């Protein structure tokens, strides 16, 4: 197959970075005037990722129709996608308004809410414990009906209700939970297993509106997902599947949203996934079952937040009764206070892998004066306890010094007496015999 030959050629020549740069230089560039308008600044997660004016999704409610989302229409493949950023706290209502107005049935989420200590997306769907969310700005209600958790993805059944018309719709939420930012999935098999789950649900069918796909910025992981799906569709539709040119398909998609595919590794992975997926297109139905087995989807999922391993205890030495003793210090001084203070501080800045830092709208957290007072009191008590420990330690050292003096005192007295008697005898000898 031609795409496989091209992949091996690029691999052998180590040309992925070069071809990725070529795509960046050849990509379309269109105006983004609406996105850059000052009143829309707080609706953009990143200041350098904006929808083109000609392909942006427009909201129908309210006096501002802007949302950072783009409609990508792949005519030959007969597939449309809405690529958007991870919702901000102030745009969650706009997100679900878009889903409602565009008649979308599926939402594909390719990131976690929190990644490497940074907030990548607001919690825009209800958790198990709360079940429901209300969006007063758009008069919508979202209910969690069911949740199927696999090792690396979760499928949620949601019910979206328009409180104005009392109409309800089923929404399927496909959440890929182990795809790292600026990275690639574990394997083409796991990715294709996920893609075909989305396909089999009917969420991509033409009788529904475009599927909504997002990650954090809505260009890297989202672009990879849509590129692979489109290439496989084209291979299935064309008489000559090998005629599909991945690079040209990506350049076509970039006419609708900037920056799709963020790294050379994501481009390389897209080729790998298309090559593997082509086996199914060419008639090998058994590969789909192989993808499922290789993906290990039935294993336990990783924890949402993996805590760092504990630090080894600090070794300290001290003198006691004239001997040196070592002991492990499991609770270093002020550790409790520092942890308490650290927990009360948060940041809304997000850092991407090329070193840029973008400020997003800060998350709104509920806090009361009572909580603040408790935190202050806890810190004060910890400081008092620490000071008391320091005082006790000082007294203990003084007691040790006194004990040492008591132990050595008889010995020192004997030495002094012996020295005095010897000196006296010597003086008597000098006087009497000389």
Curated annotation (Swiss-Prot):
Q: Any idea which UniProt keywords this protein has?
A: Endoplasmic reticulum, Hydrolase, Membrane, Phosphoprotein, Protein phosphatase
Pfam entry (one) = Y_phosphatase
Q: Top EC class per UniProt?
A: hydrolase
Q: What Gene3D superfamilies does the annotation carry?
A: Protein tyrosine phosphatase superfamily
Question: Where is the region Disordered?
Answer: 291-319
Reactions accelerated catalytically: O-phospho-L-tyrosyl-[protein] + H2O = L-tyrosyl-[protein] + phosphate
Q: Where does substrate bind?
A: 181, 215-221, 262
The entry assigns this protein to a family as follows:
Belongs to the protein-tyrosine phosphatase family. Non-receptor class 1 subfamily.
Please report the name of this protein according to its UniProt entry: Tyrosine-protein phosphatase non-receptor type 1
The species this protein belongs to is Gallus gallus (Chicken)
């Amino acid at each position: 197959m031609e795409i496989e030959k091209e992949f091996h050629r690029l691999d052998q020549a180590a040309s992925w970075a070069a071809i990725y740069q070529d795509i960046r230089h050849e990509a379309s560039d269109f105006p983004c005037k609406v996105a850059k308008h000052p009143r829309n600044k707080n609706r953009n997660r990143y200041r350098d990722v904006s929808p083109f004016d000609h392909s942006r999704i427009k909201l129908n409610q309210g006096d501002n129709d802007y949302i950072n989302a783009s409609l990508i229409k792949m005519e030959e493949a007969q597939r449309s996608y809405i690529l958007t950023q991870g919702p901000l706290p102030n745009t969650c209502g706009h997100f679900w308004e878009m889903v409602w107005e565009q008649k979308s049935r599926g939402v594909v989420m390719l990131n976690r809410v929190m990644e490497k200590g940074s907030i990548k997306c607001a919690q825009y769907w209800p958790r198990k414990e709360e079940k429901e969310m209300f969006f007063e700005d758009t008069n919508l209600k979202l209910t969690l009906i069911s949740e199927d958790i696999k090792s690396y993805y979760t499928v949620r059944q949601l019910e979206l209700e328009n409180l104005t018309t009392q109409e309800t719709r089923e929404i399927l939420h496909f959440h890929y939970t182990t795809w790292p930012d600026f990275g690639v999935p574990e394997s083409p098999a796991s990715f294709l297993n996920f893609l075909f789950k989305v396909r089999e649900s009917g969420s991509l069918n033409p009788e529904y509106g475009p599927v909504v796909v997002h990650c954090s910025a809505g260009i890297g992981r989202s672009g990879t997902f849509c590129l692979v799906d489109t290439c496989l569709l084209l291979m299935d539709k064309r008489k000559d599947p090998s005629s599909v040119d991945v690079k040209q398909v990506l350049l076509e998609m970039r006419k609708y949203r900037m920056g799709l595919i963020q790294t050379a590794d994501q481009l390389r992975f897209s080729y790998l996934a298309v090559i593997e997926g082509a086996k199914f297109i060419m008639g090998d139905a058994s590969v789909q079952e192989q993808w499922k087995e290789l993906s290990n989807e039935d294993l336990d999922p990783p924890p949402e937040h993996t805590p760092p391993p504990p630090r080894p205890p600090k070794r300290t030495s001290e003198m006691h009764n004239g001997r040196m003793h070592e002991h492990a210090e499991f609770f270093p001084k002020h550790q409790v206070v520092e942890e308490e203070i650290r927990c009360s501080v948060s940041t809304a800045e997000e850092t991407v892998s090329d070193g840029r830092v973008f400020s997003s709208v800060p998350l709104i957290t509920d806090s009361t004066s009572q909580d603040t007072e408790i935190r202050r009191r806890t810190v004060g008590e910890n400081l008092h306890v620490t000071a008391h420990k320091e005082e006790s330690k000082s007294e203990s050292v003084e007691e040790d010094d006194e004990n040492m003096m008591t132990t050595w005192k008889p010995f020192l007295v004997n030495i002094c007496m012996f020295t005095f008697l010897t000196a006296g005898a010597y003086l008597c000898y000098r006087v009497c015999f000389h």
